[in-house]
């Protein structure tokens, strides 16, 4: 199949830039750059990519490529003999959707979305907003003509979508996706109003696929900043001072911090881009050496992770303690507010700490004091499933706290608002108890604060008021 590139506004073919070079910013910021590729289908991803280390994410996308290629007749990536996937990968990947498999499509990449549609009828196959895309990668040495990206949509929930990009086009496609991530972040720094607000971004997390039973980490919990201690600004640390009275605290009620899910940490799309190697290579979205071309081993493919910048002041500590300190996964969300405070509007970060050896962070086990304090509270039910908790709610304002059966070491606030049950995770993986505006010294502190002040807990554009505790049975 001929792999060509054309503008979305018209059918005039655009001259292809040197291999690996970016497109003009106006193209990606505006109508987007369109490639004619082949869509092979998608395969369900049953776990959040945030919960996986970088190596596992890459294995997931490459296993997805292999599986879909084997299922689609005539796909070049199908291997006659290959090792069976590990049990871990088998547990992450689910069912395949081959409805449009083998169809020639127009893939339009812009800072707004990845749009897949048929070139003739203009039927939209999928339209994935950038905020819903978490990971993108090329294939392994045997599947270099393939690109895979993980995104959420109402039809396939979280799925890995596979594209066949012949004639060496795969690197251009993956490079354009990375460029879109980069420009989207720069766009925010120059004009925050152009990037969707929190409520708009969180709409993708309010869909049915984020139910706690099968997908706890991606539920719209109000403390959705995994693997991080609370950022330096944007909320009040309630542990450092006396508990405020309700009028004083009212200024924080309903205040939402805006989060952005991604940018490339290195200045990959700056001046060094023109000197980037033209062969198929591996580009870790997390890091690019300062002032140097990122030369990479042959046989690996570009990989992009929709992640967030680290403040410049972090780099000295990160680079000086790489041998003595374990490296954490930077695949998290951090407030734009802090990014603006810590990052100038000039050149983007050109230096990044390597995170090649990252590993998933598991929640800290609750300490004995916390458990003792919780057991003394009438609204604490102990270990309880989501379904059992919902059965105890009768009217708006009813609430309880339970130990999660699906997220080990996690505690969940379950309450009813407008006749609908809400489930909010109370402790993040670092053991911090917090809302988007405040951090508390215990779960009891958080619950009693909102109960006594009558302040609602704001999450994903909705509110949860704590009024009637559901007491546990003796």
Curated annotation (Swiss-Prot):
One of its GO terms (cellular component) is synapse. Tyrosine phosphorylated. Gene3D superfamilies: Pleckstrin-homology domain (PH domain)/Phosphotyrosine-binding domain (PTB), SH2 domain. Transmembrane segments: none annotated. Residues 379-470 form the SH2 domain. SUPFAM superfamilies: PH domain-like (SSF50729), SH2 domain (SSF55550). Residues 1-27, 308-328 are annotated as: Disordered. CDD domains: PTB_Shc, SH2_SHC. Residues 215-378 are annotated as: CH1. It holds the Pfam family SH2. Interacts with the Trk receptors in a phosphotyrosine-dependent manner. Once activated, binds to GRB2. Interacts with activated EGF receptors. This is SHC-transforming protein 3. The gene is Shc3.
């Amino acid at each position: 199949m001929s792999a060509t590139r054309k503008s979305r506004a018209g059918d005039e073919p655009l001259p292809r830039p040197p291999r690996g070079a970016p497109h003009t910013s106006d193209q990606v910021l505006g109508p987007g750059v369109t490639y004619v590729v082949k869509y092979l289908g998608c395969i369900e991803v049953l776990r959040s990519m945030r919960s996986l280390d970088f190596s596992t994410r890459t294995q997931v996308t490459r296993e997805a490529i292999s599986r879909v290629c084997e299922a689609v007749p005539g796909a070049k990536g199908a291997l006659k003999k290959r090792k069976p996937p590990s049990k871990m990968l088998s547990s992450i990947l689910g069912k395949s959707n081959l409805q449009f498999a083998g169809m020639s499509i127009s893939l339009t990449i812009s800072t707004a979305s990845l749009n897949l549609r048929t070139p003739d009828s203009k039927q939209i196959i999928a339209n994935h907003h950038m905020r819903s895309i978490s990971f993108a990668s090329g294939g392994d040495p045997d599947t270099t003509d393939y690109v895979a990206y993980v995104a959420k949509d109402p039809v396939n929930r979280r799925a890995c979508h596979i594209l066949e990009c012949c004639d060496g086009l795969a690197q251009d496609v993956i490079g354009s996706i990375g460029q879109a991530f980069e420009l989207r972040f720069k766009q925010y720094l120059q004009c925050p109003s152009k990037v969707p607000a929190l409520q708009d971004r969180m709409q993708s997390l309010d869909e049915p696929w984020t139910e706690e039973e099968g997908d706890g980490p991606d539920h719209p919990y109000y403390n959705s900043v995994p693997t991080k201690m609370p950022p330096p600004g944007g909320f009040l640390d309630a542990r450092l001072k006396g508990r405020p009275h309700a009028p004083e605290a009212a200024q924080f009620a309903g205040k939402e911090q805006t989060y952005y899910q991604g940018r490339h940490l290195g200045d990959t799309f700056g001046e060094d881009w023109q000197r980037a190697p033209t062969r198929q290579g591996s580009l870790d979205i997390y890091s690019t050496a300062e002032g140097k071309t990122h030369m990479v081993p042959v046989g690996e493919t570009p990989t992009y992770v929709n992640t967030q910048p680290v403040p410049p002041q972090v780099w000295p500590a990160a680079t000086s303690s790489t041998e003595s300190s374990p490296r954490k996964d930077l695949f998290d969300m951090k407030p734009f507010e802090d990014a603006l405070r810590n990052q100038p509007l000039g050149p983007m970060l050109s230096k990044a700490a390597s995170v090649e050896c990252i590993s998933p962070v598991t929640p800290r086990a609750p300490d004995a004091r916390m458990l003792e304090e919780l057991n003394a509270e009438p609204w604490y039910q102990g270990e309880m499933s989501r379904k059992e908790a919902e059965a105890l709610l009768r009217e708006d304002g009813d609430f309880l706290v339970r130990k999660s059966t699906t997220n080990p070491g996690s505690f969940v606030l379950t309450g009813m608002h407008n006749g609908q049950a809400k489930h909010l995770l109370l402790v993040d993986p670092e053991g911090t108890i917090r809302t988007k505006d405040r951090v508390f010294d215990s779960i009891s502190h958080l619950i009693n604060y909102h109960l006594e002040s009558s302040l609602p807990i704001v999450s994903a554009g909705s509110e949860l008021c704590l009024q009637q505790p559901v007491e546990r049975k003796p």
